[in-house]
């Protein structure tokens, strides 16, 4: 058996930055620091930060006054931001800069009196944060059927934007339908699209040309990790989303010659290497790094933590 390793894989710049913010805040202030929602959607990462003194909460009401509070990489609504200010917290914002760009774009379009459509998954924390960026209503669509139910004024400009963990491929069918239904609709700027989401999906497509199965390192609540699994499944290749090597079922490897391995944007490389070690123990004799898009993007932490 052999393993094909996808490139790029694992941490993106936004995840790197978010984790670094929590670690630097702990070093500067000491434990505990409070993090609103999981800073990134990965159990291994979250458990590691908990061990260092981070406390993860879903509701700011669970945070005592005058504490350190960090917003997760997914972003928060204006209401959550105000609630945190009201308890005199020291705030560090780990929102991915690409998510922040979407927030600013939504606010800008609404100031221009546009009706704004958000393509995304209902209930995802990034979507909840984007929906809560202003008092004006955004209309959320998840499917083509949702587009048919939109209640829009014919005399007001229309714009759309997307959840950053959805690639161009993920949203193409909805975008195409929106453009056919509303020919003058404004599209987001190209640089609002998350480079990491698209690159990791493109990497999986390359792997799937030569792989019998795909193993995706990532947590079940990670949107981008689930999309990687779905790409393989749409190509009729068995794919499994796993937290770590312990979750691999040996039956998956029966009669398999080539195993594709990748990791979602919030999964650390150490987990990939543990999987490789496990597979080598099970008979893998060759591990090949497959070429993909090069990434050299870095997002700095807030100046207060430098």
Curated annotation (Swiss-Prot):
GO biological process, one term: isopentenyl diphosphate biosynthetic process, methylerythritol 4-phosphate pathway
Pathway: Isoprenoid biosynthesis; dimethylallyl diphosphate biosynthesis; dimethylallyl diphosphate from (2E)-4-hydroxy-3-methylbutenyl diphosphate: step 1/1; Isoprenoid biosynthesis; isopentenyl diphosphate biosynthesis via DXP pathway; isopentenyl diphosphate from 1-deoxy-D-xylulose 5-phosphate: step 6/6
Binding residues annotated for [4Fe-4S] cluster, in chain numbering: 12, 96, 194
Active site: 126
Cofactor: [4Fe-4S] cluster
Species of the source: Ruthia magnifica subsp. Calyptogena magnifica
Cofactor comment: Binds 1 [4Fe-4S] cluster per subunit.
Record-given protein name: 4-hydroxy-3-methylbut-2-enyl diphosphate reductase
InterPro entries assigned to the protein according to its UniProt record, in alphabetical order: LytB/IspH
Keyword Calcium: no
Protein family per UniProt: Belongs to the IspH family.
Binding site for (2E)-4-hydroxy-3-methylbut-2-enyl diphosphate: 41, 74, 124, 164, 222-224, 266
EC number: 1.17.7.4
Catalytic reaction list: isopentenyl diphosphate + 2 oxidized [2Fe-2S]-[ferredoxin] + H2O = (2E)-4-hydroxy-3-methylbut-2-enyl diphosphate + 2 reduced [2Fe-2S]-[ferredoxin] + 2 H(+); dimethylallyl diphosphate + 2 oxidized [2Fe-2S]-[ferredoxin] + H2O = (2E)-4-hydroxy-3-methylbut-2-enyl diphosphate + 2 reduced [2Fe-2S]-[ferredoxin] + 2 H(+)
CDD domains: lytB_ispH
């Amino acid at each position: 058996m052999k393993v094909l390793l996808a490139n790029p894989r694992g941490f993106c710049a936004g995840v790197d930055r978010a984790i670094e913010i929590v670690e630097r805040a702990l070093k500067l202030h000491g434990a505990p620091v409070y993090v609103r929602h999981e800073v990134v959607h990965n159990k291994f990462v979250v458990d590691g930060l908990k061990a260092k003194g981070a406390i993860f909460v879903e509701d700011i009401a669970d945070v005592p006054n005058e504490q350190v509070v960090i917003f997760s990489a997914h972003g928060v609504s204006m209401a959550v931001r105000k609630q945190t200010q009201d308890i005199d917290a020291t705030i560090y914002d780990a929102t991915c800069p690409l998510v922040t760009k979407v927030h600013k774009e939504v606010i800008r379009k609404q100031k221009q009196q546009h009706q704004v459509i958000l393509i995304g998954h209902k209930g995802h924390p990034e979507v909840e944060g984007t929906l809560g960026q202003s008092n004006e209503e955004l209309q959320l669509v998840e499917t083509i059927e949702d587009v048919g139910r939109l209640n829009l004024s014919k005399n007001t400009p229309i714009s759309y934007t997307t959840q950053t963990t959805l690639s161009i491929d993920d949203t193409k069918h909805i975008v195409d339908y929106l453009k056919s239904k509303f020919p003058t609709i404004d599209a987001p700027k190209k640089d609002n699209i998350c480079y990491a989401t698209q690159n990791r999906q493109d990497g999986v497509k390359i792997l799937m040309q030569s792989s019998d199965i795909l193993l995706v390192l990532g947590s079940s609540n990670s949107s981008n990790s689930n999309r990687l699994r779905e790409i393989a499944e749409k190509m009729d290749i068995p794919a499994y989303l796993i937290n770590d090597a312990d979750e691999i079922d040996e039956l998956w490897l029966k009669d398999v010659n080539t195993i594709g391995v990748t990791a979602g944007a919030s999964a650390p490389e150490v987990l990939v290497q543990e999987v490789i070690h496990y597979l080598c123990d099970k008979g893998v004799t060759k591990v090949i790094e497959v070429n993909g898009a090069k990434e050299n993007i870095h997002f700095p932490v807030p100046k207060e933590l430098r």
